[in-house]
């Protein structure tokens, strides 16, 4: 046996955070990566083929985590990165004093690594429902290694 300690870096599953899609096939309501941020497309316009080549797609999109507006122009025949976006519901168990939430997973475990949302309205809705003893379910959106609470709803009756 060796007395050496081994330290292994945490690794991810190896799954890609994005997948390629032709710019001409991305539609309003879809997702796209602009400036390395996952975004929801709110407007797409296409210019005609000019004398110097390809038709171009002009995308106007909103960052799904920061709500900032981003724009990009891409030749319609080129591929764009499209983020994998997942949305999962969890039941709220606790809100800590330092602004973290404790959530119940489907498998019965807890998820304790999320902060309260940056949206003050959502945070107020969560705190009010929690303080009143109501059953609160939060939707967590995840994409490209980021996670954020994006919706809150009350289920069933209170205690």
UniProtKB/Swiss-Prot annotation:
Main location: cytoplasm
Tissue-specific expression: Ubiquitous. In roots, expressed mostly inside the stele of the mature zone.
Gene knockout outcome: Severe defects in plant growth and development. Delayed dark-induced leaf senescence. Dwarfism, defective sporogenesis and shorter primary roots. Impaired protoxylem development.
Highest rank taxon of the organism: Eukaryota
SMART domains: eIF-5a
Mod. after translation: Lys-51 undergoes hypusination, a unique post-translational modification that consists in the addition of a butylamino group from spermidine to lysine side chain, leading to the formation of the unusual amino acid hypusine. eIF-5As are the only known proteins to undergo this modification, which is essential for their function.
Induction: Constitutively expressed. Up-regulated at post-transcriptional level by wounding and pathogen infection.
Gene Ontology CC terms, in alphabetical order: cytosol; nucleus
One MF term in the entry's GO annotations: translation elongation factor activity
Impact when changing residue 2 to A: Loss of phosphorylation
UniProt keyword terms in alphabetical order: Cytoplasm, Hypusine, Initiation factor, Nucleus, Phosphoprotein, Protein biosynthesis
Disordered: region residues: 1-25
Record-listed Hypusine modification sites: 51
Entry-linked SUPFAM superfamilies: Nucleic acid-binding proteins (SSF50249), Translation proteins SH3-like domain (SSF50104)
Annotated localization: Cytoplasm; Nucleus
Compositionally biased region (Polar residues): 13-24
Gene Ontology terms: biological process: defense response to bacterium; positive regulation of translational elongation; positive regulation of translational termination; programmed cell death; response to bacterium; response to wounding; symbiont-induced defense-related programmed cell death; translational initiation
Basic and acidic residues biased stretches: 1-10
Modified positions (Phosphoserine) in chain numbering: 2
Family: Belongs to the eIF-5A family.
Protein task: Translation factor that promotes translation elongation and termination, particularly upon ribosome stalling at specific amino acid sequence contexts. Binds between the exit (E) and peptidyl (P) site of the ribosome and promotes rescue of stalled ribosome: specifically required for efficient translation of polyproline-containing peptides as well as other motifs that stall the ribosome. Acts as a ribosome quality control (RQC) cofactor by joining the RQC complex to facilitate peptidyl transfer during CAT tailing step.
Assembly: Homodimer. Interacts with AHK4 and AHP1. Cytokinin regulates the formation of the AHP1-AHK4-ELF5A-2 complex.
Protein name: Eukaryotic translation initiation factor 5A-2
Organism: Arabidopsis thaliana
């Amino acid at each position: 046996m060796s007395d050496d300690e081994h330290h292994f870096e945490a690794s991810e599953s190896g799954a890609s955070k994005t997948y390629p899609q032709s710019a001409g096939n991305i539609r309003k309501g879809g997702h796209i990566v602009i400036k390395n941020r996952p975004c929801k497309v709110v407007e797409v316009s296409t210019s005609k083929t000019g004398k110097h080549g390809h038709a171009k797609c002009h995308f106007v999109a909103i960052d799904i985590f920061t709500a900032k507006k981003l724009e990009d122009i891409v030749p319609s025949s080129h591929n764009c990165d499209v983020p994998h976006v997942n949305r999962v519901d969890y039941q709220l168990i606790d809100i800590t004093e330092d602004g973290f939430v404790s959530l119940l997973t489907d498998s019965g475990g807890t998820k304790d690594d999320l902060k309260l949302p940056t949206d003050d309205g959502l945070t107020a809705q969560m705190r009010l429902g929690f303080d009143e003893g109501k059953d609160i379910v939060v939707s967590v959106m995840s994409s490209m290694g980021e996670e954020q609470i994006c919706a809150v709803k009350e289920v069933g009756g209170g205690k």
